[in-house]
Amino acid sequence: MKKIGMLTSGGDCQALNAAMRGVVKALAHNVDELEIYGFENGYKGLIYENYRILTSKDFSGILTKGGTILGSSRQPFKLMRVPDENGLDKVAAMKNTYKKLGLDGLVILGGNGTQKTANLLREEGLNIIHLPKTIDNDIYGTDVTFGFQSAINIATDAIDCIHTTAASHNRVFIVEVMGHKVGWLTLYAGVAGGADIILLPEIPYDIDKVVDAIHKRTKEGKGFTILAVAEGAISKEDAALSKKEYKKKLAKSKYPSVSYEVADRISERLGLEVRVAVPGHTQRGGSPCPYDRVLCTRLGSAAAKAIMDEDYGCMIAMVNGQTKRVPLADVAGKLKTVDPKSQMIKEAKRTGICFGD
């Protein structure tokens, strides 16, 4: 009898169910006796023994279903060693649940914070396999994360829709795209959506350069401008501040997000009406796109093979079009950021896209 636990942690995305399905279908097809324990609401389920035994029926018809059938929650890594309000040792509780159920392995689906806790559990002696989930595409060691392509599609659609109204009213429009620390989603959606200006966390912007780019378009007879702005975009002035100083500034800011500050500064300089559109959590929602369905089926199948090989302590990555087992110890806690000198940035700039630098 092979007993495997599974949980989804952190922010949801479109392809979590597809990834779990890939794991279970491959295991069910190749392992004679199998029990799947689904922990509810992420690490909380593992800590407080909230789980249910899943059957193949639970994974039928979920390939196209967004969200997660197990539920999810955020359990910050920095608090994992801190006892809960009742004094419970969370790490010890997770180990106890794992051993009490007699699990052979635990498949954890999540992003960077989830991955760090997965590695902690590996260090504590649990058999762990991590599947890289995030719309941000910022997990080190894999070329792509599941959820990223689906989110690109939604963010691109948002920019596409703004184009028509911006053109009709000769407006400057900012579309705010998810991504506090990295700009992968904004970069890809911005290029795909034909944004004229793209602002990323990795490339601090000069507001004067942004204004010049808009002014240049106006002089060329182009009455509207589209900006794709990441949630974590930062000006050169703010980038020069210490982390503590920047946090203080944000706490005192009158703006709900950086996009509104950018809009205000453009409006002040050019006297133009600037509108902001925020697709927000729609970027996490809906059905996974075909690419993510294929990716998750492959990653899930590869995770099942690692389980059958009893090769744990790894993340199942996609590298050069091939699935690969990457040691968790080598990647946990590392962030994959956009390289400002990358070929893609250079190619985008060659087409006239302004990055504010």
Model-predicted segments: where are they?
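Short, acidic/small-residue loops that bind anionic groups at enzyme active sites
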Residues: 121-145, 199-206
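Glycine-rich oxoanion-binding loops at beta->alpha junctions
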Residues: 48-106, 146-153, 157, 357
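Phosphate-binding loop/pocket of nucleotide- and phosphate-handling active sites
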Residues: 261, 316-357
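Short glycine/serine/threonine-rich phosphate/pyrophosphate-binding segments
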Residues: 12-23, 46-47, 91-92, 103-119, ...
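Short glycine-rich or small-residue beta-strand-to-loop segments that form or flank ligand, phosphate
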Residues: 3-11, 69-71, 104-109, 173-176
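N-terminal phosphate-binding or glycine-rich loops at protein starts, especially the Walker A/P-loop
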Residues: 1-50
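Accessory alpha-helical/coil subdomains and C-terminal extensions
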Residues: 97, 108-110, 116-120, 148-167, ...
